[in-house]
Amino acid sequence: MVTTEEISLKNELIRLLKDVNCVKFGDFTLASGKQSKYYVDIKKATTNPKVLKAAAKLVNYYVSKENNENLKIAGVELGSVSIATAVSLETEKDLLIIRKKAKEYGTKNKIEGELNPGDNVIVMEDVTTTGGSVSKAVDEIRAVSGNVKKIYVIVDRQEGAKENLAQNNVELIPLVTIEELGLNK
């Protein structure tokens, strides 16, 4: 059931995303390789403290209603680290940073932060199209016996990510959809 608090938090995030003009129009190639007539320049949002705070509050609203035992918040470098950090601060849950490739020096870690077998992990993502990028992070976490059941994304372009991730037993929870930003899929 949707509450007035959820609606209020979501509407504030939508307003802030529009305020930072994060949707651009033109001809773009997305990370998925798809061509698009619009681009969600999410870095305009994820470098804005008001947007980060609003997104973190909305995720905390959702997370506070669930079992939070051994919960960690993960973000994939570079795009999702600021989001995951904001959510970690808001929820007071430990932060994990998932590298795209392992360090070639020191510990040579691919996952930074303390991840123990059996820990529950929520992965944060900035934008999803097909879900391919974030799916790799899920695989990395699961490879070391972490449990990933949910991914929270600031903006879902509604182009298959939800369905693709569901095939990997992961629920994609968009904080905002592209439709809610006023664009058709």
Swiss-Prot record:
UniProt keyword DNA damage present: no
Q: Which GO terms describe its biological process?
A: 'de novo' UMP biosynthetic process; pyrimidine nucleobase biosynthetic process
Entry function: Catalyzes the transfer of a ribosyl phosphate group from 5-phosphoribose 1-diphosphate to orotate, leading to the formation of orotidine monophosphate (OMP).
* GO molecular function terms attached to this record: magnesium ion binding; orotate phosphoribosyltransferase activity
**According to its UniProt record, which reaction does this protein catalyse?**
orotidine 5'-phosphate + diphosphate = orotate + 5-phospho-alpha-D-ribose 1-diphosphate
**What family does this chain come from, according to its entry?**
Belongs to the purine/pyrimidine phosphoribosyltransferase family. PyrE subfamily.
Which residues does orotate bind? 129, 157
Subunit comment: Homodimer.
The record's EC number reads 2.4.2.10
Instruction: Identify this protein by name.
Output: Orotate phosphoribosyltransferase
Q: Does the keyword Translocase apply?
A: no
Lineage summary:
Archaea, Methanobacteriati, Methanobacteriota, Methanomada group, Methanococci
Residues reported in the UniProt entry to bind 5-phospho-alpha-D-ribose 1-diphosphate: 99-100, 103, 125-133
Q: Which gene encodes it?
A: pyrE
> What does the record give as cofactor?
Mg(2+)
Gene3D superfamilies in alphabetical order? 3.40.50.2020
Q: Which UniProt keywords apply?
A: Glycosyltransferase, Magnesium, Pyrimidine biosynthesis, Transferase
The record's section on NCBIfam families has: pyrE
Q: What class of enzyme is it?
A: transferase
Q: Organism, per UniProt?
A: Methanococcus maripaludis (strain DSM 14266 / JCM 13030 / NBRC 101832 / S2 / LL)
HAMAP family per record: PyrE
Q: InterPro entries annotated for this entry?
A: OPRT, Or_phspho_trans_dom, PRibTrfase_dom, PRTase-like
Q: In what pathway does it function? A: Pyrimidine metabolism; UMP biosynthesis via de novo pathway; UMP from orotate: step 1/2
